[in-house]
Curated annotation (Swiss-Prot):
Stretches with biased composition (Basic residues): 14-30
Protein name as it appears in the record: Uncharacterized protein NECTIN3-AS1
Pfam families named among the record's database cross-references: DUF4672
InterPro entries recorded: DUF4672
Amino acid sequence: MLPVQRRKLDPLLKKYRHHKKATRTKRRRKEKMEAQCSPVPPTPSTPPQSEEDEAVDKKPTLLSAQEDTPDLLHEDRLQYLQEEGSGVMHQECQIQSCELSVAQKPRPSSPAVTSLASPPLCFGSFLSCVCQTFSRSRKQKPPRRKGNNQAEAGGDAEVLRPGPAKPELSLSKTCSHLKLIELSFVFSFIVLSVCHCSS
């Protein structure tokens, strides 16, 4: 019998081959995760003395747990990073406009350059924050239903006639309107700075 036919007829070799392949891919995945994660420092044997030490001690245990079971915690870690990133971005937006204006004041330069550089950047970061908070508030609000109370009250209750539908702006339209406003402000700053420099 040819070896190819023997391999096709014998299921044990095939199962063993797949087992080897699965073990190899798991090993590679584990090595890749270890390469991405930084090496975990050894935890001290003494008990933590303050709250900061407790917070530091919790992080290495989380990292070691993630290295042991990367597939199980992958989705939880992504969700945590997204929530943490949105919170950090929201905090950065509030601080960023002040930092930009402070950072550009000490530099000695012409008034046209500072007036052109600082306001549009601050305004752009402000608008991006507005868009993000608006999108968050739209996601958190549950949809309202107005006709349910009257339907539950009985047949004697007045039935409201549906009036003309109110146009609701979607998030993308609102952000595009804000971008247009931002562009108009930038253009007005440019025109005013050019007029100021020429006079």
